Regions:
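Short, small-residue-biased leader/transition segments that mark boundaries at the very start
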Residues: 2-6
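Well-ordered alpha-helical segments within folded domains of soluble proteins
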Residues: 7-16, 75-86, 141-153, 181-183
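Non-catalytic carbohydrate-binding regions of carbohydrate-active enzymes
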Residues: 17-22, 27, 32-33, 38-49, ...
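Acidic/histidine-rich catalytic neighborhood
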Residues: 38-93
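Short acidic (Asp/Glu) and glycine-rich catalytic loops that position anionic groups and cofactors
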Residues: 59-65, 82-87, 125-130, 145-147, ...
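Short, flexible loop/turn elements at secondary-structure junctions
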Residues: 62-66, 115, 153-155
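Hydrophobic alpha-helical scaffolding
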Residues: 70-77, 94-97, 137-142, 176
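Polar, glycine-rich mid-to-C-terminal structural blocks
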Residues: 75-115, 119
Length: 183
């Protein structure tokens, strides 16, 4: 399971990009969609549905950060969101899996938000940033939480201005102020 959480998800954007670039419906139908659906199947089984306030949410615990186990890291939430978003879109295009779309949309509608914190390390600009997990992990050695922007393309130029500004703050804090992996 750990390898599925860590490694296999990185292939989802590659399959999507190939289809989006070529428009090859045979590739989508026989290669990309089956692979993306397998990743979705994994997430459906692996994620936990829990009560949250007066509703519920789906959570994910992964070990993608050098052997730490994190609840709802933005990097993993981005891959989940990308996977189910593509499954909904591609299943409509291919005319398949209509009965599964309700579940996929439910997951998309009930994913946690990315945790936003005020940075704790200096120097910093005193601006909110995305944390590495729901607990507010603030290790500034890399900006893994921006997988939402790349490779997942969930956070993009069409995202709301607040989310984009927090992404800019995050990149500056983790990669410029704290010098990323350069120290």
């Amino acid at each position: 399971q750990r390898q599925m959480c860590i490694r296999d998800r990185f292939n989802v954007p590659l399959f999507s990009w190939y289809y989006e670039y070529t428009g090859d419906l045979n590739f989508l139908r026989y290669r990309a969609y089956p692979y993306i659906r397998l990743c979705g199947d994994f997430y459906e089984d692996y994620m936990q549905k829990e009560t949250y306030g007066k509703s519920y949410r789906y959570t994910i615990t992964t070990g993608g950060h050098e052997d730490s186990w994190d609840l709802n890291p933005p990097s993993d939430l981005a891959f989940v969101k990308q996977t189910f978003g593509l499954l909904v879109r591609y299943s409509k295009l291919l005319g398949v899996d209509q009965k599964r779309r309700k579940k996929w949309n439910d997951i998309l509608s009930h994913l946690p938000e990315y945790k936003v914190i005020m940075p704790t390390k200096t120097p910093n600009q005193g601006l909110p940033v995305y944390a590495k997990n729901e607990a507010g992990w603030d290790l500034p050695s890399h900006a893994i939480q921006l997988h939402a922007a790349y490779p997942c393309e969930i956070l993009n130029l069409h995202s709301d201005s607040t989310a984009l500004q927090i992404a800019r703050n995050t990149l500056y804090y983790y990669e410029v102020s704290q010098k990323g992996f350069t120290n």
